[in-house]
């Protein structure tokens, strides 16, 4: 009997990118990546990261792909912080159309409540920082939808398993030393 080895994935054609510009979207997932090692200006840090994902109204046109006809899903990674300079805070305030009150900041904001919330996304094609030959559709702005827009409903179930690449990122999380110490007490 033959034992055949194949290259099972690297020959797949990349999906076409969604159109750049402004598009209607709905939040379809919030993934907690846990504590991740990051590097900024040569300094290594450990920060709690999350990913917010949206389905956009544009569908994938790639007949050879298993995703043909499905909505594009875009995402953005954030540090889990509502600090004054935090990108998460800036984007949430833009999406909500209003700043957080001091009481909201003190009480915190439950990101899981974003599932199913509509918005407009600014989408820009940008080269990868490491490999400029790779181009991605990045979320550059999040705005509240205009009044009267027909709301989108996520096709992705709230409790659906994250994609493989997200699971791999979660697996890279640094163990929370403080939580382990509290469990040991």
Question: Which residues fall in each region the model found?
Answer:
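Short beta-rich binding modules
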Residues: 1-185
């Amino acid at each position: 009997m033959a034992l055949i080895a194949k290259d099972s994935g690297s020959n797949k054609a990349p999906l076409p990118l969604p159109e750049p510009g402004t598009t209607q979207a709905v939040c379809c997932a919030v993934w907690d990546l846990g504590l991740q090692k990051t590097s900024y200006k040569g300094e290594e840090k450990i920060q709690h990261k999350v990913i917010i994902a949206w389905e956009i109204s544009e569908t994938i046109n790639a007949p050879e792909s298993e995703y043909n006809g499905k909505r594009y899903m875009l995402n953005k990674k954030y540090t889990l912080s509502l600090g004054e300079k935090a990108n998460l805070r800036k984007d949430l305030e833009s999406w909500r159309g209003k700043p957080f009150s001091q009481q909201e900041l003190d009480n915190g904001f439950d990101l899981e409540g974003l599932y199913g919330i509509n918005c407009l996304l600014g989408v820009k094609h940008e080269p990868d920082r490491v490999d400029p030959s790779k181009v991605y559709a990045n979320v550059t702005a999040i705005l509240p939808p205009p009044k009267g827009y027909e709301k989108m409903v996520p096709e992705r179930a709230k409790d659906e398993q994250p994609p493989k690449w997200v699971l791999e990122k979660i697996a890279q999380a640094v163990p929370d030393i403080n939580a382990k110490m509290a469990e040991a007490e």
